[in-house]
Amino acid sequence: MAKRKVPAEFVVERDDYKCIRCLACVRVCSYGANYYDENANRVYTENYKCVGCHFCEAICPTEAITVRRNNFDIRPLAHWTPEHLIGIMKQADTGGVLLTSMGNDRPYFSYFDRIVLNASQVTNPSIDPLREPMEIRTYIGRKEAKLEIEEDGEGNVALKTEIAPQLKLEVPVMFTAMSYGSISLNALLSLARAARTIGTFFNTGEGGLPKELREFKDNMIVQVASGRFGVSADYLNAGSAVEIKIGQGAKPGIGGHLPGEKVTEPISETRMIPVGTDALSPAPHHDIYSIEDLRQLIYAIKEATRYEKPVGVKIAAVHNVAPIAAGMVRAGADYIVIDGIRGGTGAAPKVTRDHVGIPIEFAIAVVDQRLREEGIRHMASIVVAGGIRNSADVIKAIALGADAVYIGTAALVALGCHLCQTCYLGKCNWGIATQDPKLTKRLNPEIGARRAANLLRAWAHEIKEILGGMGINAIESLRGNREALRGVGLHEYELKLLGIKPAGEAW
């Protein structure tokens, strides 16, 4: 029987006139796609090995290389795309689950792109952020319903109400949970240093805490997931907050999976598992099967941290996200994290990543509204994630009801990621999603930190510009202010769920 060949996804084109046979592309490709033929004195590429990371293209000194998508031409069939056919061929070969990485790449609607912002004109003067102060500082944590002040006989006043622990963000953007193992130590160090420079936070993810990150405790959130890798009382007290991960947007309802190829000696020590074994996180926490169980864990962590740190809970955005979020707040969560269908991952079944969950825009709106209706919105902050691409997405998310956002993919792109979606292989040529020492050294954490900090610094400038144009001088005035938003080309029921009006409709 003739075997049907799986076509290459990418084609590497090489200008033989420009190529000087330096063999840099041969040496640097961790996938072994490029090779040199001494007899012909030419460099060739086995295109089926290319993942489209563009590293060879970037390091070629004469710009002789171009990597492009391979047009897999078949008889035009709307229902059977090349992606479907390639998936069937791979599964027929292996009998296995198709794995992938990064975020959902399906052509679903991006609702952020169908939402526009307001601006001040004539009757409500705009504000120049270069000449007037703009407040974008954000506090994450439980707020009090009211503040009580006490006064002594001499007219001095003091705050009587005890304030719950808060995370102070100088910009309403944090670096999301990415574990040591899924990404390299140099990548984590880049984000940690950037967070300290800007005055925000990074999240360790579920992979435990390498000793190199301990110095960043004032800008670090530690995570407790179902695998409980590296979790101890010392770990819980090592950061500024603790986050319980129930689910994530890229793979709702299933656990985590770090392939054994990525479990090196340092990862083994940090996660407390044998070298080379797959690190599997169960789908559920085996001590959480109800809101009451979640409450027990939240307060166990609060006891272990002496009630000095905010405790958050992270879930994926699913159909009944609003009542779940309300239950989490009533269970004692100081902040909740909602991760949408565009959320990224180091490894996930392709079918789950592409088809499970809901867009983050709807999740923000319905959760914020539900908490307001129940009168508990002040009891927890809302942090959202899953496809935040730029400062406009940040502003729209906050106007829909979020307090702050997490970014992951955008941060990795700042470090050099080219979204080749093969993080799970552990061969990242850019030194990000790999544990190979020969590859990780390609990412300089000092340069990475500078680039990640530059990204947040640029977004902060843009957020201030937009706020000033709206006539708003504090981000508090934008939070949940859906009158500042209008929908373009959205159906009536979509506008109703988002809580916004169509473009052209005045106040």
From Swiss-Prot:
InterPro entries: 4Fe4S_Fe-S-bd, 4Fe4S_Fe_S_CS, Aldolase_TIM, GltB, GltB_archl_type, Glu_synthdom. The keyword DNA damage does not apply. It comes from the Bacteria. It holds the Pfam family Fer4_10. [4Fe-4S] cluster 1 binds at residues 19, 22, 25, 60. Its EC number is 1.4.1.13. It is an enzyme of class 1 (oxidoreductase). This is Archaeal-type glutamate synthase [NADPH]. It comes from Thermotoga neapolitana (strain ATCC 49049 / DSM 4359 / NBRC 107923 / NS-E).
